[in-house]
Amino acid sequence: MRILFMGTPDIAADCLKALYEAGHDICAVYTRRDKPVGRKQVLTAPPVKEVALAHGTPVFQPRTLRDGGEDENIRALAPELIVVVAYGCILPRSVLEAPKYGCINLHVSLLPKYRGSAPVQWAVLNGDAETGVSIMQMDEGLDTGDVLACEKIAIDPEETSGQLFDRVTAVGARVLCETLPAIAAGTLKAEPQAHENASTAPMLSKEMAEFKLTDSADHIHNWVRGMNPWPGAWFVTAGGKKVKVMECRVAESHGEAAGTVLATKPLTVACGEGAVQLLHVVPEGKKPMDGTSFAAGLRLKAGNSL
């Protein structure tokens, strides 16, 4: 089957590698434009572009698919199927209808749950026990197409979104490769989504990463896991200093006021409900450190307020 691949970040690059390894015919790759990266703003190619060029596949990087005759260019490439993984551009109807088998998308949630750009993170933020991957026949809506295949994935209660994303990527690449032969054979039954059960997973921001020590310990624990590695959950101390928390654990409390230091080895703080051990933190303007070192730097003792 002649495939045109569309994708941009690491998850898409891993899926593209899997397609090459499975022997699929990738006629072309579409990805986003190179972007300046880092302090020196070095122009850097998307991961997908690097993989495609390493395999000698033509790469296209249009600003949008809605103008400039890109639909005609895609038709000229004559793909039988378009595979989309985190591309970052809306596909117009003219592109959706171009291939014989249409366009499919790998979405890293169990649709219709968590439609949008950050499904893995929101599964962790909400303390879910499981998530999954879905292969969807694309339509003009946002993650609203019929589901062709899916697989559930258990979430470890201490797992960060970054750790989960690595596992989800591997499962997604495998399920994608397993689904393609069935698409070509016409043996898959597309299941319409239960749109009334849909939820969204909006993009994360640094502002929404804030939590308060008056929140419950479970909420803080999930927030820290879900915001790791980016943007990093944070709170403001009683002294007005911003502290990013990269790892914590839920601990017991005995009714102390939120923010009260219960212990310093490890640094344990009472919350609105329960308590948390702050294991790894990044104080504002400083390097990462363990919670005990942070407490020592502030000369905190049990009974103090953080």
PLM regions and their residue ranges:
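N-terminal Rossmann-like dinucleotide-binding module
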Residues: 1-40
